[in-house]
């Protein structure tokens, strides 16, 4: 089992958007919701929480966490992802979060493995199965063997067969699997039994 240490925030430069915002997009900025503006401007910050092996006490890697703008009610991940669910933007926020965590992990040249949070909803989404995450980390020069897909338990799932199939796909590409907070949340023992993760993380 692996335990999470207190969160550390690293100094980092802001990464530019994937493509330059057009003038027309700028004109429409005022009509966006705060969450849409966060997505458009990539106003998310990555934090990294050290992960230790409970058996040996040795450092293993980091869990990548995400925060909204510090001056926004959406700074808290609970508020950020809650708003995303209400506005049907969960996939967009999670994918952007993943990209920023990966970019920052590489930029800071952090050692060890990166535990990357993935919700069951996103794991089962067709767009998550097309290799975009693998392509993205390869462009960053990061090996998939250093990335652990950490299944979050912030929402229930009962499609265990679908999750097994999806995780077989990612294991075949070199990723490992972790479950967050075994013993808490929904059906965690069933999830462990069905998915057989390489890691169990305890906060």
Regions found by a protein language model. Name each.
Residues 47-49, 65, 115-119, 150-152, ...:
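A cross-family glycoside hydrolase active-site/sugar-binding cleft signature
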Residues 70, 83-88, 118-123:
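Conserved protein-kinase N-lobe ATP-binding Lys motif
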Residues 1-23:
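Cyclic-dinucleotide signaling modules
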Residues 70-74, 98, 181:
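Short acidic-capped amphipathic helix/loop micro-motif used as an active-site/signal-coupling element
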Residues 91-162:
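Catalytic core of bacterial c-di-GMP phosphodiesterases, primarily the EAL and HD-GYP domains
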Residues 137-203:
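The catalytic core of metal-dependent phosphodiesterases that act on cyclic dinucleotides
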Residues 20-83:
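Active-site core of bacterial EAL-family cyclic-dinucleotide phosphodiesterase domains
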């Amino acid at each position: 089992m692996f335990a999470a240490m207190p969160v550390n925030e690293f100094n980092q430069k802001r990464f530019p958007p994937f493509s330059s915002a057009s003038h027309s997009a700028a004109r429409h900025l005022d009509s966006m919701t705060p969450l849409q503006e966060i997505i458009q401007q990539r106003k998310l910050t990555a934090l990294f929480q050290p992960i230790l092996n409970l058996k040996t006490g040795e450092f293993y890697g980091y869990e990548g966490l995400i925060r909204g703008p510090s001056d926004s009610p959406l700074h808290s991940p609970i508020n950020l992802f809650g708003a995303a669910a209400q506005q049907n933007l969960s996939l967009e926020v999670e994918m952007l979060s993943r990209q920023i965590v990966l970019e920052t992990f590489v930029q800071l040249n952090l050692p060890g493995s990166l535990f990357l949070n993935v919700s069951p909803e996103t794991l089962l989404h067709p767009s998550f199965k097309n290799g975009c995450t693998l392509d993205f980390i390869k462009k960053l020069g990061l090996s998939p063997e250093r990335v652990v897909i950490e299944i979050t338990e912030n929402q229930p799932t009962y499609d265990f067969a679908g999750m097994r199939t999806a995780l077989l796909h990612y294991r075949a590409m070199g990723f490992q699997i972790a479950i967050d907070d075994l013993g808490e949340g929904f059906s965690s023992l069933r999830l462990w039994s069905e998915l057989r993760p390489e890691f169990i993380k305890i906060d």
